[in-house]
């Protein structure tokens, strides 16, 4: 998705960059690779032992933000910021301080829970503010991001709320009306939410003819 957006912007004469926390950038793509394997392992272990996914990777995030200051973007488009490569407190403090317009495309529910990326399969609604927010997580050991030794969902929920709210110019994008509905029940409800479905490759996926449908 990021590469498609990048290439479209480039074709339209816009300057664009991609920052990633995994592997390397595709050939010809301008951008920045955040962190390294050693930092990734340290962040994973911090989460395993203390349940703090998103709160590691301090030094590599500082280096990334230094690079971002050199780029001076007119807009920052976030996608998944979990995955053990960013320190969310530093990132959002920077975005708030510099008053940069932000688009945040959510691909799951991690941003507004105290632990998990999905909760429908266990019918959990603790993440809703009316229910007091996440606490006593029953899946912190069994569901990504796998906090094996400590349930830190209550602290995570409170801190994420403090970190992710209060951005002056932020718009959330979801790929489905279902996820939009969840966001509007979460502590992110202060932000406008737009639904933009994920695109598909029309060279591979095309409507069938009536004859093909009957086969």
Where is each model-derived feature located?
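Carbohydrate-associated surface elements
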Residues: 178, 199
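Short aromatic-enriched loop/helix-cap "lid" or pocket-rim segments at secondary-structure transitions
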Residues: 27-32, 90, 114-119, 124, ...
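N-terminal subdomain of nucleotide-sugar transferases
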Residues: 1-31, 69-71, 96-101, 168
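Membrane-proximal helix-turn-helix segments that form the acceptor-binding/catalytic region
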Residues: 96-97, 110, 127-172, 187, ...
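A short, histidine- and acid-enriched strand-loop-helix "catalytic/donor-clamping" loop
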Residues: 80-85, 106-117, 140-148
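A short, charged, and often flexible helix/loop element on the N-terminal side
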Residues: 29-62, 80, 143-152
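Short N-terminal targeting/anchoring amphipathic segment
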Residues: 65-86, 100-107
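A short helix/loop element that forms part of the nucleotide-sugar donor recognition site in Leloir-type
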Residues: 157-160, 206-215
């Amino acid at each position: 998705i990021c590469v498609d957006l990048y290439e479209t912007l480039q074709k339209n004469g816009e300057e664009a960059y991609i920052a990633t926390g995994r592997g390397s950038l595709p050939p010809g793509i301008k951008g920045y690779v955040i962190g390294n394997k050693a930092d990734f392992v340290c962040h994973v272990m911090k989460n395993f032992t203390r349940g703090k996914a998103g709160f590691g990777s301090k030094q590599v995030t500082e280096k990334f933000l230094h690079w971002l200051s050199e780029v001076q973007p007119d807009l920052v488009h976030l996608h998944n910021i979990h995955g053990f490569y960013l320190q969310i407190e530093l990132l959002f403090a920077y975005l708030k301080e510099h008053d940069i317009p932000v688009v945040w495309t959510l691909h799951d529910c991690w941003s507004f829970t105290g632990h998990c990326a999905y909760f429908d399969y266990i019918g959990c609604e603790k993440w809703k503010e009316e229910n007091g927010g996440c606490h006593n997580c029953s899946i912190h050991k069994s569901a990504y991001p796998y906090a094996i030794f400590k349930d830190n969902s209550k602290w995570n929920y409170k801190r994420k709320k403090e970190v992710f709210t209060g951005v002056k110019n932020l718009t959330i994008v979801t790929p489905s009306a279902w996820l939009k509905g969840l966001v509007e029940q979460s502590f992110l409800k202060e932000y406008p939410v737009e639904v933009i479905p994920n695109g598909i490759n029309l060279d591979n996926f095309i409507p069938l003819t009536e004859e093909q449908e009957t086969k």
